From Swiss-Prot:
SUPFAM superfamilies reported for this sequence: UBC-like
Protein name: Ubiquitin-conjugating enzyme E2 13
GO molecular function: ligase activity; ubiquitin conjugating enzyme activity
Family stated for the protein in its record: Belongs to the ubiquitin-conjugating enzyme family.
CDD domains in alphabetical order: UBCc_UBE2N
EC number, UniProt record: 2.3.2.23
Length: 151
């Protein structure tokens, strides 16, 4: 199977393994090198601090012309991530460019944990609470992190 992988995916995978992003691990699946097991540590300056979040990342056949498919497997209370783990992030949708890489996507998701954006929500109920009672939303996010994101 590895013989069929485009050079770009092989190079990106090698770089991710040799030079990992701080707070993020991304390991290709043994049976499918287009599928990555991702772990992101909750940033220290966020309600997700102390948590470790599991994600799955899949590179479609069209990659890099099409964006990777990424979703959270760990439950998270965040206005830009819905109950199914889907992520509202422009570079995963209309702002995707073949110049971007897996590492850019992972860094952007990590940044989204530090800076939730209730103005562009995917989970409207969470976003509403974030806008009307941010302190309570942060408290809930911390509680969910303790409940669901412990390694």
């Amino acid at each position: 199977m590895a013989g069929q992988l485009p050079r770009r995916i092989i190079k990106e995978t090698q770089r991710l393994l040799a030079d990992p992003v701080p707070g993020i691990s991304a390991n290709p699946d043994e049976s499918n090198a287009r599928y990555f097991h991702v772990m992101i540590a909750g940033p220290d300056d966020s309600p997700f601090a102390g948590g470790v979040f599991k994600l799955e990342l899949f590179l479609p056949e069209e990659y890099p012309m099409a964006a990777p498919k990424v979703r959270f497997m760990t439950k998270i209370y965040h206005p830009n991530i819905d109950k199914l783990g889907r992520i509202c992030l422009d570079i995963l949708k209309d702002k995707w460019s073949p110049a971007l890489q897996i590492r850019t996507v992972l860094l952007s998701i990590q940044a989204l944990l530090s800076a939730p954006n209730p103005e562009d929500p995917l989970a409207t109920d969470v976003a509403e609470q974030w806008k009307t009672n941010e302190a309570e939303a942060i408290k809930t996010a911390k509680q969910w992190t303790m409940n669901y994101a412990q390694a």
